[in-house]
Swiss-Prot record:
Record-given protein name: Methyltransferase/helicase/RNA-directed RNA polymerase
One MF annotation (Gene Ontology) recorded for this entry: ATP binding
Organism: Raspberry bushy dwarf virus (isolate Malling Jewel raspberry/R15)
Catalytic reaction(s) noted: ATP + H2O = ADP + phosphate + H(+); RNA(n) + a ribonucleoside 5'-triphosphate = RNA(n+1) + diphosphate
Keywords associated with the record: ATP-binding, Hydrolase, Nucleotide-binding, Nucleotidyltransferase, RNA-directed RNA polymerase, Transferase, Viral RNA replication
Length: 1694
């Protein structure tokens, strides 16, 4: 046999590959020619397989990498014939090595299948290394290392050396420090780095890292595949001979041109070096034959620099000739605007061809995407066919939350400023970098990016010392439709064990000690958490107690010295026995003293908290806990523990360290932020391009308002046949037909109401060019005009239908753009899921029906209805449910059953795919649906045996149409014969809940078999962040609430904290059962859902749990919260009213200031006023209508006794509202100005040039002697204005249903005239049009003092623009609500005087006509009629013994909408107001722009009542009267004796009890209100008191008591006299002893509390108001203020 040269054979079959020992496993020299050819064939297959595949054994992934340095015996058998001879094998553990040149006598078949073959680890180098390690370990007998030297140790060492021998060697030329080299080795462990240290340039570490990043990114793709390097350094690829990599290097600025020139220079330098080394060879053909010497030299160059010179020669030829494939200068990427829409090509998107012709499936970006927008990058990837991209960038997680930072590993400083992010490198004087932050940040936050139908997902793979590795990968295959939610966390590793401490910062300007010589503020420092914890723990036990009543600076200094000693002992470096011990971390000298002071503050605060805990233990904490009363009742405990009152804590801290920045945040030591969660939501829907993803910007309303649309998912999966379903051929007549007819009519009516609203919205846009009147509509209005795109965007872009101006049309969406025929489109929440629209079209004709056999299972909550459905299921049964959550639960329990047999009722009616295939029907939660819908589903199914499951006393069907009364609300109303089965045993509810449910169930008893006795916990909270987390419970938790608003807030928190837990509304939770339930209320706004009137909702809410329910409420004091009352199960105790009047000490006669009466004569009219009257709606040809209003008999001046007992005032206030006297909002006001704040004010415009801290803060006020709980005067600041806007204009609770707006408005006006207008007198009113008059305008100017020099034409003036301000004088609450909620300032929204004077004149004429023709049982306190005492005395003496009813409206002004405006307009027009003026005034209120010029805040609003225009009070009075007339029935109207209406206040006096339905007030008029049956007559903060033959309207004495301690009286005697005069004028009736005695009783009756000190307090008020001298004894006045409060008293408008 001829001997072959195997070395030639080897290089011919495995050219360029590194040899493994398993390539030489066969003893080939022993083979014949035939066997040798078989061996060569198998060897080639082995080499080819190793180059492209891996072992595939996951258990060996830690050993075997993609280079396949090991091969198993099983794999070798698959490549070589079994009878071929193999070489000898040397093994250690599972690793074996073929010994070259040996023959073992065994065959391939004898190789072990699971043995790993490869890696020459038995060389002499290995043995020498192993011997040295063993000798060193064994030489140290005390270390015990000798015990570790074993077979396993040797195996690990062999593996390590084997990996090093086969790792990729990369030279790193930059000059680096040892720490930098260590970091690079840690970052890139798969490479063997050769640090040559021969290049020193700018930011070497960043350059070296970028070099290795390039190698790492390229290793993710096949070796020879074409790869795009976007914006990359083409010289780097040339340097390493990567001919398959193409760099797109556009010339975007001068620096790009400079870089390209430098790269060409480096290329020439490299080739010059090669010419010097290889002489003329370098210019020869690279494929030409070279001498052996030159060839060997090139091999050495290849080993050292990982590139062959021949490859460089080939690439350089292209660069030299100007046609290199390594790079181009074309810009990469395509923007969305460059995408072409071609309607002629199947309505598709066309992406233009790129300027660069290079195509590749793979791409990399090495720090080159900073200025390339992500959307443009994706467009470029689509152009070039890229499916996967890997990239790197400089990043810091703190960029998402901070404005500046430092990356130590890269020595890189970064800073965000003016929309850009700036980079600079420490100790580097070269140019820095800056990039657009909006473009840059997308790479840190985006997860899903799309271009047309191409859908890419971005992953942030790893973050290493300032460098972020990311990948962008195209999604292949079909995309599931629906919502896809992604999130990722940015972790701040360096902050894990840190505290953020607030420390004092003192700047001493000079040593004089004068004002301004010392500047004090606060700053933040980062400290070790372990250090701070240790020092505080020790010092808590070591500081000396402090007597704050007599503070000694020496005590403070001693305590600080103790803290500083401990701080030093834990932070300084110690030397013990010659050894240096470093304790924690050193504290910089500038931080040492401030940190010790802050720790001192924290210790004081901790002691304070300890005292609170002890007081809490003694006093007990209940749901009615209030801070003010709690502190007031426990002062004695605080004195005993701390030695000073609790409300002096901040004063002490400020006195301890005097600075201008007062202590407003009591949290001195805070944990640092450890992570930030970034969320993104993607919706994939059907569009013209196919499955097109739509990205949604992350915000509360868009991402977390998850609607559980009944049937939406099922519709997409069901049949698309929209034809009429087949029905069984049966003839049916009877009552069910009427029920189904009502259901279909209801569906049509709802569609009609939605259509009319859409039509009104479209008309408003066509008339005004904007969506005036619907900007703040809670129905999420959207208007699209093809001429301008979206005029107003909706929150969601997934509506099924839209209104085109004439009808509803079905929509398809292209991203956020709808596809429809026509110009206009209107969408609302009502057009998103239009089930009723589909019903009304699909079932246009009502089929005749017969009644099947129906069994009704009416069971209490938790009786096992759903469990029985699951247990009884068999093939042939169809299961339907009204509730989508219930369907999901049944499907989970019956996972093997086809989903088409378990569906919602709505889904089944729209696509009845199983008609005729079932013989029995189960319908769960039947009570939630209209009975006609149930009967229709039964008829369509053709099933004669039906069982309905539900609870007749849980949440019933909700009628969403306010003006569509239903005859059939439940199946019980149908009149069919049901086989009813009552089930009264609950298996779910614990025993304590069952006791409460026994009182709620009216028709069924309830009992439980649960062994859980106690399950109720009530927890007062302040926000959603205090709601317990799911991990606090043992088992699954369900979170439920009443409103979608509360649901979205908690879902937002869960998403931010990466918490997965079920959150539902109570309505959506019906039918569910959980071990633990958290029932929460976040809104403090009164809502009808929380009252007893919504009993079914409360029944469902408290009965979802088996073990535990926690009720978290922000309003624990709300007595109208039925769930709270039921869970508390408190017993109301009655208190006897006591009357304890002390004798008068002296008698005083009331002394009033002289005030000459002004005769009511016609004012003298000036020329400007006459001109204004002629310009603005002058009166008609009829005479100006005036009517003299009768003046009722005067009330004789009362005389009485008075006494001076100031303590009785404080006692009376504490008896009525415990804790109010200790209210001090000074600290809260300061916290509002300097503390963190979150406002929900919607869209506002803020002029930043007007931002100012506080205005009008220099006024001085008189100091009251009595702590009555009066509130401080508010400062005008941006924060106070923001709070006021949030309370007065934002967050309107929408409770309206759908209704016919015009029809109901006309009915309300008709009822108003029928109730309150004497039509005979009305018919005698002048027929002329009301207008303005010069006398009326002049009277307005005389009264207000506003002199208008330049009159304007109102019709040509922008009356839709209002000015805004806040009322600095805060109206205090008559309850104890101020203790638990910060009182926000009221707002005033007003016109310019030139507009107000005209409007006032016109409305003044309307007022006189209204008063002239109203019925006597209506009284609106306007002008002369404000003397209610005379009115009631003349017409209704004796009515104090009748029945009184009071309607208490909440958020009255901002709850008004379009229907209220329409009612007002119709009444004005009927009374003869100029239609042009009415239309002008109405349009101005439809959409108004409001601007506060003090702080620069502006916003828009719609129909909300303006709080300061010319028609506010009268307009509110008309609306209130019209609403009450609409809801009160005619029989109850006959019982009414009189009705008082003033703004939103009302009082009805009737001869017997009447019913005032509250549902229409909420469903139609959007009013949140409650019905009050007062124990005594009370109207507009006045008590109605009978005194002899008179009825007196006496002001609420509680207000008078509080006003004796007013804190807003300017510090001068003149203001004090004015305030006293005004109080004495309004409180004149209290000076009568009989009135005082009756008033003391009535107040106790109204407050339901005993107040024995009240009579004494009223006598003290009498004494105080008797003279200025007496009143001044309650204040300290130093006359430091120039402001004078004036009580305006003048003529009244007639």
């Amino acid at each position: 046999m001829e001997c072959l040269d195997f070395s030639k054979l080897w290089f011919s079959t495995a050219a360029g590959l590194q040899q493994r020992c398993y390539y030489d496993c066969v003893a080939w020299e022993c083979l014949g020619d035939d066997d040798l050819q078989i061996f060569i064939s198998g060897l080639n297959r082995l080499i080819e397989s190793v180059a492209v595949s891996c072992t595939g054994d996951e258990d060996l992934d830690f050993v075997v990498d993609s280079c396949n340095e090991f091969v198993t015996g099983r794999d070798l058998k698959s490549f070589f014939a079994a009878d071929l001879p193999v070489r000898e094998v040397s093994s250690v553990g599972c690793i074996s090595h073929f010994i070259p040149g040996s023959v073992s006598g065994l065959n391939v078949s004898d190789l072990l299948d699971n043995q790993l073959y490869g890696c020459s680890v038995f060389s002499s180098d290995f043995e020498s290394k192993l011997r040295d390690i063993r000798d060193a370990a064994l030489s140290d007998a005390a270390s015990g290392v000798s015990q570790l030297v074993s077979c396993h140790f040797e195996k690990d060492v062999r593996h390590l050396l084997a990996e090093n021998a086969n790792s990729v060697k990369i030279p790193v030329p930059q000059k680096l420090s040892d720490d930098d080299m260590r970091i690079l080795r840690d970052h890139f462990p798969r490479y063997e780095l050769k640090f040559t240290q021969n290049v020193d340039g700018p930011h070497n570490m960043a350059a070296a890292h970028r070099l290795l990043e390039t190698h790492d990114l390229l290793s993710n793709f096949p070796a020879d595949a074409p790869i795009l390097d976007i914006g990359g350094n083409w010289f780097s690829h040339f340097r390493y001979g990567r001919s398959n990599v193409h760099s797109c290097c556009p010339m975007l600025d001068l620096r790009d041109n400079e870089r390209h020139t430098h790269r060409l220079t480096m290329t020439e330098s490299l080739m010059s070096s090669l010419r010097h080394r290889y002489a003329g060879t370098i210019d020869l053909d690279p494929d030409a034959h070279l001498s052996r010497k030159v060839s060997d030299s090139m091999k050495e160059f290849y080993k050292r620099w990982a590139v062959h010179p021949k490859d460089l020669i080939r690439l350089y030829a292209g660069i030299r000739d100007g046609n290199s494939s390594l790079y181009c200068h074309h810009k990469f990427g395509v923007s969305w605007n460059d995408v072409l829409w071609e309607s002629e090509r199947n309505n598709c998107l066309t992406v233009p061809e790129p300027e660069c012709p290079f195509k590749a499936k793979y791409a990399i970006m090495v720090h080159s995407g900073y200025d390339l927008p992500l959307k443009e990058l994706i467009g470029g990837m689509v152009q070039h066919g890229v499916v996967e991209l890997h990239g790197t960038m400089i990043a810091d997680p703190a960029m998402l939350v901070a404005t500046s930072g430092y990356i130590p590993a890269l020595r890189c400083n970064w800073e965000k400023s003016k929309g850009q992010i700036w980079f600079s490198f420490r100790d580097d004087s070269t140019m820095g970098y800056r990039h657009d932050w909006e473009v840059y940040s997308k790479y840190l936050t985006s997860t899903v990016v799309s271009c047309g139908k191409h859908f890419y997902v971005m992953e942030r793979d790893k973050y290493r010392h300032g460098v972020l590795f990311y990948s962008i990968i195209k999604c292949s295959g079909s995309l599931r439709k629906g919502d896809h939610t992604f999130f990722h966390n940015a972790w701040f590793h360096e902050m894990y064990d840190k505290y953020i401490m607030k420390v004092p910062l003192v700047k001493v300007k000079d040593l004089t000690g004068d004002e301004g010589s010392v500047e004090c503020s606060w700053r933040e420092v980062v400290m070790s958490r372990k250090l701070v914890d240790r020092v505080i723990e020790v010092c808590l036990r070591g500081v000396k107690p402090i007597n704050f009543g007599n503070c000694d600076d020496a005590v403070h200094m001693d305590n600080l010295r103790i803290i500083q000693n401990h701080l030093l002992s834990h932070s300084q470096t110690l030397v013990l026995n010659g050894s240096t011990i470093i304790r924690e971390e050193a504290i910089p000298f500038k931080d040492f003293s401030p940190v010790s002071v802050t720790i001192y503050f924290e210790i004081l605060l901790t002691r304070y908290k300890e005292s609170l805990s002890l007081a809490w233990f003694h006093a007990g904490l209940g749901p009615d806990f209030k801070l003010g009363s709690w502190v007031s009742s426990l002062k004695r405990v605080f004195y005993r523990i701390l030695g000073f009152p609790a409300n002096l804590l901040k004063y002490v801290l400020n006195a301890l360290f005097r600075c201008r920045d007062k202590v407003s945040d009591m949290e001195f030591v805070k944990p640092a932020v450890e992570k930030l969660t970034v969320l993104e939501n993607t919706y994939i829907g059907k569009s013209l391009m196919g499955d097109c993803p739509t990205l949604k910007e992350y915000d509360d309303s868009a991402f977390f308002n998850i609607l559980e649309n009944v049937g939406n998912e099922l519709f997409n999966n069901s049949s698309t046949d929209s034809g009429k379903p087949e029905t069984p051929e049966v003839t049916m007549t009877g009552n069910p037909n009427a029920v189904i007819a009502e259901a279909i009519s209801y569906c049509r009516a709802e569609v009609d109401r939605i259509g009319k609203k859409c039509e009104r919205i479209l008309h408003a846009y066509q008339a005004t060019g904007n969506c005036g009147g619907y900007l703040n509509d809670t129905d999420n209005v959207g208007v699209f005009d093809k001429m301008t795109s979206w005029v107003q965007k909706p929150k969601e872009f997934d509506h099924e239908f839209g209104w085109d101006g004439s009808s509803f049309i079905k929509l398809s969406w292209f991203g956020k753009i709808p596809d429809f025929v026509g110009r206009y489109l209107v969408v609302t929440d009502g057009t998103r899921v239009t089930t009723n629209l589909k019903f009304s079209r699909q079932y246009a004709t009502i089929p005749a029906t017969v009644t099947p056999t129906i069994k009704l299972v009416d069971g209490v909550t938790g009786c096992g209805k759903t469990t029985e459905i699951v247990r009884r299921y068999r093939p042939g049964i169809l299961i339907l449910s009204v509730c989508k959550a219930n369907v999901d639960e049944i499907r989970r329990k019956l996972a093997a059953v086809d989903s088409k047999f378990i569906r919602t009722v709505d889904s089944y009616l729209l696509s009845p795919s199983v008609t005729g295939s079932c013989d029995e029907l189960f319908i769960d939660e039947y009570g939630l649906s209209h009975p006609g819908i149930l009967l229709l589903a039964i008829h369509i199914s053709g099933i004669r045996k039906v069982t309905l499951f539900g609870d007749s006393e849980q949440i019933p069907f909700c009628n969403r149409l306010a003006d569509f009364p239903l005859k059939y609300n439940s199946v019980e109303d149908v009149g069919l014969n049901f086989d009813r089965e009552i089930r009264s045993t609950t298996y779910r509810c614990p025993q304590d809940i069952t006791l409460s449910l026994q009182k709620m169930y009216k028709t069924k008893p309830i009992k439980t078999v649960s062994t859980v006795e106690s399950s109720i916990t009530i927890k007062p909270i302040k926000s959603e962040f205090e709601i317990p987390l799911p991990n606090a419970f043992d088992g699954p938790v369900l979170y439920i609430c009443m409103t979608k608003h509360d649901e979205s807030l908690l879902k937002l928190r869960w998403a931010k904290e990466n918490i997965s837990s079920e959150v539902r509304t109570v309505h959506a939770a019906q039918g569910l059962s959980y071990k633990n339930v958290v029932y929460f209320r976040l809104t403090r706004t009164d809502n009808d859902l929380y009252t007893k009137r919504k009993l079914p909702y409360h029944l469902v809410a408290i009965s979802r749990h088996t073990d535990k329910i926690v009720y978290c409420t922000t309003k624990p004091e709300d007595s109208s919260d039925f769930s709270l009352s039921a869970l508390k199960n408190t017993i109301k105790t009655s208190r006897d009213l006591t009357q304890e009047a002390s004798g008068s000490e002296s008698s005083y006669a009331v002394v009033f200031e002289s005030n000459s009466e002004v005769t009511a004569t016609k004012p003298e009219v000036c020329e400007n006023v006459r001109k204004a009257a002629e310009m603005n709606f002058p009166v008609s040809s009829d005479a100006l209508y005036q009517k003299e209003v009768p003046i009722y008999g005067a009330i004789p001046d009362p005389k009485g006794k008075a006494s001076y007992n100031p303590g009785s005032v404080i006692r009376a206030i504490e008896e009525l509202t415990p804790g109010n006297t200790s209210i001090d909002t000074d600290a809260l006001d300061e916290l509002v100005e300097v503390g963190p704040m979150s406002l929900q004010v919607g869209s506002i415009r803020w002029d930043v040039s007007k931002i100012s801290p506080r205005l009008f803060t220099n006024n001085k006020f008189a100091v009251p002697h009595l702590p009555t709980g009066a509130l401080l005067r508010r400062n005008t600041s941006s924060r106070q204005v923001g709070l006021a806007i949030e309370k007065r204009n934002a967050n309107v609770m929408n409770s309206q249903k759908y209704f016919d707006l015009e029809n109901l408005a006309n009915k309300a006006v008709e009822r108003f005239f029928d109730f309150f207008i004497d039509m005979e007198k009305f018919s005698k009113l002048p027929t002329g049009v009301l207008g303005s008059s010069a006398e009326q305008i002049q009277t307005y100017q005389n009264k207000t003092g506003n002199k208008v020099t330049d009159p304007v034409c109102v019709a040509l003036s922008p009356i839709q623009k209002y000015k805004h301000m806040i009322k600095r004088d805060v109206k205090f609450n008559l309850t104890d609500g101020a203790q638990s909620e910060y009182t926000k300032a009221a707002t005033i929204t007003y016109h310019q005087p030139e507009i107000t004077q005209v409007a006032t004149a016109i409305f003044g004429q309307f007022k006189t006509r209204l008063l002239a023709c109203r019925n006597k049982f209506l009284n609106i306190p306007l002008e002369h009629d404000n003397d209610l005492s005379g009115y009631l005395t003349k017409y209704h003496l004796g009515s104090e013994n009748n029945t009184f009813t009071e309607i208490d409206f909440s958020k009255f002004d901002k709850s008004q909408g379009e229907i209220h405006q329409l009612i007002q307009d119709l009444i004005l027009i009927k009374f003869g107001c100029d239609p042009e003026f009415v239309a002008l005034w109405s349009t101005a209120h439809r959409s108004s722009s409001i601007f506060d010029q003090n702080v620069g805040i502006g916003f828009k609003t719609d129909f909300q009542r303006r709080t300061g225009d010319a028609f506010t009070f009268l307009g509110n009075s008309l609306v209130t009267a019209a609403m009450l007339a609409f809801v009160i029935s005619d029989p109850d109207r006959e019982k009414i004796r009189y009705m008082l209406v003033g703004g939103d206040d009302s009082l009805i006096c009737s001869y017997g009890p009447i019913q005032v339905p509250l549902e229409p007030l909420g469903d139609i008029f959007n009013m949140s209100c409650k019905l009050v049956q007062p124990a005594c007559p009370y109207f507009a903060s006045r008590y109605l008191i009978r005194r002899g033959d008179e009825i007196l309207c006496v002001p609420d004495p509680y207000k008078l008591l509080v006003k004796l301690g007013r804190k807003d009286v300017p510090d001068n005697q003149a203001s004090l006299c004015e305030i006293r005069t005004g109080l004495a004028d309004s409180a004149k009736y209290i000076f009568d002893d009989i009135v005082k005695q009756k008033l003391a009783i009535l107040v106790q009756v109204r407050y339901n509390k005993a107040a024995p000190s009240l009579y004494d307090a009223l006598c003290t008020v009498h004494w105080a108001l008797s003279s200025n001298t007496n009143f001044s004894k309650f204040y300290t006045v130093t006359n430091t203020s120039n402001e004078v409060r004036r009580n305006r008293r003048g003529v009244k408008i007639t």
